[in-house]
Structures are given as structure tokens and as C-alpha cells.
Amino acid sequence: MSTQNDSIALLLLQITLYHQQELAHADSSLSLDELLVEPIVDNTVVEKFTSHSMVQIYAPELAPLNIRSIKGLISDLFTNTNIQEPKNLITLANHYYSERLNYLQEEKIPELIQQMKDEYRKLAE
């Protein structure tokens, strides 16, 4: 998955996780542990995800998705993400967060530092 897709996946997982916490708080008959493995995806998740500025800017093709499509994306994340620990919304979000941090530390920050050095050299000449 590309870095941009990793960021979108992380966003979807964060929105879904937050909603599961809200649902478990509002309805004591729901188990958060179960919701973390079998999340309830409803219009709230769809609306928050599809209207998010990151989706609008970096993945506009995802903006018209419906509940079924979002459920499919989440299912794909559960199926296709290769992690060692048991899969749930938290472990998946941690994985994509870690991927994002690694990208920033190993690629983006060194690239920005090099650009700053290059600009400094140009100014010093």
C-alpha cells in the first residue's frame, strides 16, 4: 500500500474506532472488545470519513462511497494487513500509524533536511 493509502487507511480506522467507542458508551449491551473485531459501520462512519478533508483532497474517488463499500474497505484492511498480533481496530491502526511514522522518519524528514541544506547553500553563494 502506498504511503498516501496508508494515511487514508489510518484515518478510516481512527474514525471507525472512535465510533465504536461512542456506541459502546451509549449502549451497555454492546461489548467494545467485540466491536473492535466486528465494527458497526453506519452512516456516521461513512459521513465522517467521506467528508473528511484528507479524503476530499487526497482520495476524492472515495468520497461517494456508501456503507457497504466502507465495510468492504475495513474488511480488506483486516484481511490484507500483515501483522503478527491479533487483528482488531486498535492493532490495525497502530500498524498504519507505525508505517506513517517510519515513512516520515526514513524518507520525508531526510528529504526536507536535504532541501533545507540545498536552499542554504544557494543563499550562501
Swiss-Prot record:
Example of a GO biological process term: chromatin organization
Subcellular location: Nucleus
Key words, A-Z: Activator, Chromatin regulator, Nucleus, Transcription, Transcription regulation
Annotated GO CC locations: nucleus
Family: Belongs to the SWC7 family.
SUBUNIT field: Component of the SWR1 chromatin remodeling complex.
Record protein name field: SWR1-complex protein 7
Gene: SWC7
